A protein has these predicted regions:
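Cofactor-binding beta-sheet edge motifs in enzyme active sites
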Residues: 1-180
């Protein structure tokens, strides 16, 4: 039986093409010493996105140094805009994965402004973000959201490589500090 339902909306061949291009562009087989890699893939809005995240741990602080993303969103109408959307989604996702924390007391959010809610800072943004597209003649599909979700799992998988422990609770930086 199919574990995710009777039918799948996604095309396994397109997923495979994304992962094949990601393996090539990320130079997956050439992981540098001291770099911990995580990978994740996601399907939404009829688009396919996958990312490899390189994490380095210095002074017991994990830092995302590099992200390589591959997206299949059909025909890319405006490549510069699509790259910008992917980069923004990736940066926002890293910020949420590592630092984003919402706490509530009696149903009221305890962090209700930017002075108490940590956002990723420019010096915490990866120095290298590469975005690549699978070239095909498929109709254009969603571009803004698909690169956002996979970065969470890719960061968690890189942290697993660094520590041997799984990270399930965000923000991961808190979990990393507790377990290191």
């Amino acid at each position: 039986t199919n574990p995710v339902g009777e039918t799948n909306d996604y095309d396994a061949g397109r997923y495979a093409a994304v992962l094949t291009l990601l393996r090539e562009k990320s130079r997956w087989a050439e992981t540098p010493a001291g770099v911990h890699r995580g990978v994740s893939a996601y399907f939404c809005h009829n688009s396919y996105a996958a990312e490899v995240v390189d994490v380095v741990v210095k002074d017991n602080i994990p830092t995302v140094e590099r992200v390589v993303a591959v997206v299949d969103c059909g025909i890319v109408v405006n490549k510069d805009a699509a790259i910008n959307m992917a980069e923004g989604a990736i940066i926002d996702g890293i910020g949420n994965a590592l630092y984003g924390e919402l706490t509530f007391k009696d149903g009221v959010p305890q962090k209700n402004n930017f002075n108490s809610y940590k956002l990723i800072r420019m010096n915490e943004v990866p120095k290298d973000i590469e975005v690549h597209f699978v070239e095909n003649e498929k109709d254009p599909t969603g571009m803004g959201e698909p690169p956002f979700p996979p970065v969470f799992a890719a960061v968690a998988n890189a942290l697993f490589k660094a520590t041997g422990r799984r990270f399930y609770n965000q923000p991961f930086i808190n979990e990393f500090a507790k377990k290191s």
